[in-house]
Amino acid sequence: MNIDQHHQLQQQHQQQMLQQQAQAQAQAQAQAQQQQQAAAAAAAANAAATTSSSPRQVSFNVSDHYQILEIVGEGAYGIVCSAIHKPSQQKVAIKKIEPFERSMLCLRTLRELKLLKHFNHENIISILAIQRPINYESFNEIYLIQELMETDLHRVIRTQNLSDDHIQYFIYQTLRALKAMHSANVLHRDLKPSNLLLNSNCDLKICDFGLARSIASQEDNYGFMTEYVATRWYRAPEIMLTFQEYTTAIDVWSVGCILAEMLSGRPLFPGRDYHNQLWLIMEVLGTPNMEDYYNIKSKRAREYIRSLPFCKKIPFSELFANTNNNTSTSNTGGRTNINPLALDLLEKLLIFNPAKRITVEDALKHPYLQLYHDPNDEPISDKIPEDFFDFDKMKDQLTIEDLKKLLYEEIMKPL
């Protein structure tokens, strides 16, 4: 073999090696691409959503008809993601709930699911669809597909001063939803700014029915408080003073607290604890008169009220008044004047004695809301059946497995 032939063989060998390396690289790239595609497919199948503030991933095992966008909310027992329903290109919210670790979460989920299916109202959040599990064995999480609302009243109050027009419209829509709920014999029991969802059109929808109950007879109220964890700042005084009977007036009180917060930009009664909460209320409303005092059925609660120093009522017009020389706007969130009609409605919403508090129907007729009030466009709802909340009456006997079966049955029913 001469040198030329040797070089020729070497060149051929090198070319073969280069070809093999190129093939190997191409195979590796193809393999990596396949892995990436598989990972992307898995991510799409699981609809994994990651918050910008956190590196953790939350898997959403939903139909590939939905493209998950981002996490928009996180609560005590659920995570909400925005998504696009691909066939219709509609933006939706998907709420993922994993309730099966605690019976209380199962109960809350069951209440919410049943009530949202019952109501069909413009100012109550609705369920568009439910992701149904393949079978009972694979039923470990719940996915509710709902209307997407951009924000909530809590966020809005924190970031801007609301105009009087906005306040009127938000209170009107809240009361309009309450009229439907109360006509169905349902108490929400947890109304607060973060449970009032809003979109860019200023449409308002009440959400979170996990603490809701039927307007029950006195004996059915036994155990009413056992799970009462509603935000203290919006709780009616009769709840803390253990009145024998709870009525629609507890929701009306919460509306009053929300109205006051919109007017001032901050909570009206931000109690540190049970005692401080009552004291803050009495500092504004004054010590109850004899009639209201004896309306409190609990002797222990009456004795507690009696032990507190006497308070004189402060009219809301005085509480929210700005000084003319602009040295203080602390009670009005920078607002230069407040509509006197708003304060008049507030006086009627925040009355200590629930029997004297304005009703939702009368609040809707109040002059402050006359721009929006239309009795022909404030629908009522069908009353819930008597056995609607039967599971609540038996909750001490129901295991998590029992509640899981009830939830599965509810989810598998048509909407």
Swiss-Prot record:
Alphabetical list of SMART domains matching this protein: S_TKc
Domain Protein kinase: 66-369
Keyword field contains S-adenosyl-L-methionine: no
Example GO BP: cell division
Pfam families in the record: Pkinase
Modified residues (Phosphotyrosine): Y228
Gene Ontology molecular functions: ATP binding; MAP kinase activity; protein serine kinase activity
Regulation: Activated by tyrosine and threonine phosphorylation.
Catalytic activity: L-seryl-[protein] + ATP = O-phospho-L-seryl-[protein] + ADP + H(+); L-threonyl-[protein] + ATP = O-phospho-L-threonyl-[protein] + ADP + H(+)
PROSITE patterns from the UniProt entry: MAPK, PROTEIN_KINASE_ATP, PROTEIN_KINASE_DOM, PROTEIN_KINASE_ST
Family classification: Belongs to the protein kinase superfamily. CMGC Ser/Thr protein kinase family. MAP kinase subfamily.
UniProt domain comment: The TXY motif contains the threonine and tyrosine residues whose phosphorylation activates the MAP kinases.
Protein name, as recorded: Extracellular signal-regulated kinase 1
Species classification: Eukaryota, Fungi, Dikarya, Ascomycota, Saccharomycotina
Gene name of the encoded protein: CEK1
